Amino acid sequence: MGFRKILAQDQKDNMSGHDSTQRQKTLEGATAGRFVAAITVAALLTLGQGCRTGEDDVHRWANTAQGPRKLVAVLTHDKYPMDLRIEAAETLVSMKPRGGRRIGIQGTDEQQGLVDALAQMPPAPRTALIAKLVPNLQAEMAKPAPVQVVGQPAKTDMSVPYKDAAFAILTHEDGALIPDEALRKSVRASLAQWCTTNFADRLEDSSQLYGVEQVLRELKAEGVRNLPDQILPNANKLDRLAELTAELGDAETKQRAGQKLVDVAKFVNSNAWVAQKRPGVEAANKASKLTPTEDQLKGQLAQYQDEELLRVFSSMKKIGGKAVVEFLLGFVQDKAAVEKRRVAAMAALQGNLDRNSAAQAQIALSLAGDPATPDPLRDLSLARVGEFPRAMVVEKLYELFKNDKWQVRWVAASLVLKMSDTSQVQEFMSKLSSADGLAITEPLSYGGLLADLKGSTPPAELAAKYSATGNSVPARLTALSYYYAAGTPADISKIESFLKDGTAAPKCKADAKDCEWKCTVQGAAGSETKEIKTVGEFVEFCVKPALDKRAKGLSK
């Protein structure tokens, strides 16, 4: 019994120990389970936090090989917050070029850039995204451009890629990415402002995907509306400002540009301009170790002023308009002005005069007929006369046939022929008949112009008519010169009858400059100059050799 009690107690103790062990195991198992579960949750939380894309990732990807691909994924996937998607877009824009290419905007053959990625998005979410992106691009475009310092490396204009992105989005598929008209108008205004701010530097910035000129041509009149504000004394790229305004500007913009150019021209032509530039010229002389006298320095400044004023006149020619024409017409009439400058001013009037203005025509005619007018200015004055209708100016041109200088008549008569047709040849010959002191250059050139006339009567028929005896000598010589300029070997027989014509040829006035009656012929001993005293000698030594030479050329 005692044994059984001891055995029973042992069993009870054993059972108690077993139960205790089991309870401990159960407790330990439960604790371990809770620990594992906690670790798992923590790991998941940590993993979730580690995979969440943030701005730091977006910025870091700008410098990694696969960065553009990841940025496009963030941009186009709606699971990301809008602000992060916008940040991804801006990062694509601001990425440094790779291999000389802005892959963030343009993409590559293997990877989309910003614009193509936007184009692939569904319209509604894309429109919402662009509505938030574009104002950010505009804000970056509006930031001040860096101030460039002469002699130092050029500073990077950080707004360039934002301008390029805005332009690319605006123009992609004819504006399909910006259906909102108000936003499109706003972008166009921002682009115009960007191009006309710091114009000269941005015009030359080769880092742009789309140059200033390309952008302005897309914007047309709207793009250049503010360009006249850049037309100032000492402005760089004045010629390009004028050219783009002339090409793209509306009437009001061109008018403002014209007035601004007049203001610049007046300043450049002033003593104030000379005083402003003098220190720079003196410094340049010093740097070159030159020591000009006062007169030499004045000569340098005058030449500098000539060059600058001629550049302004060149820009004026492109713009035209009332203000420009009035200024230039006044300038060409100023006898105190430097001849070179007057000539340049008259050249700048080409194509800008009012064809219906008799007053403007009269200014050009008066200059052409004034004995004091320098010959280069006279020639250009007559060229400007040629821009007016024949009926308005022809009688005034005929009056110039009486000018003491044969060169004036020559240019005026040539102009009349260029403005005429064959029905008006009789009128021309009649006026030429009273001309005094012709030079041989005149009929020889008139004959060539006669050959070019249009009309119902063939020039050859007119040549035969007016070369005959009974016409005035100037008319006959002009008609015979038709054969000199345009005759064929078949015409030799037509002129041979004049070889013995003893009618006296015209004589130069005693003081006529460069006037002569001579022709050079080829003889056995070489070339020989022949004095021309008669109509027959004119035919023999001037006209017939030209036809003979033409015949030899055809026989080869």
Regions found by a protein language model. Give the residues of each.
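N-terminal secretory signal peptides that target proteins for export/translocation
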Residues: 1-31
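Structural detector for internal amphipathic alpha-helices that build alpha-solenoid repeat scaffolds
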Residues: 53-64, 83-97, 116-121, 149-182, ...
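N-terminal Sec signal peptide cleavage junction
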Residues: 49-51
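Hydrophobic helical h-region of N-terminal Sec-dependent signal peptides
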Residues: 35-45
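Short extracytoplasmic
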Residues: 74-86
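Amphipathic alpha-helical scaffolding segments comprising HEAT/armadillo-like alpha-solenoid repeats
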Residues: 65-75, 98-150, 175-200, 219-232, ...
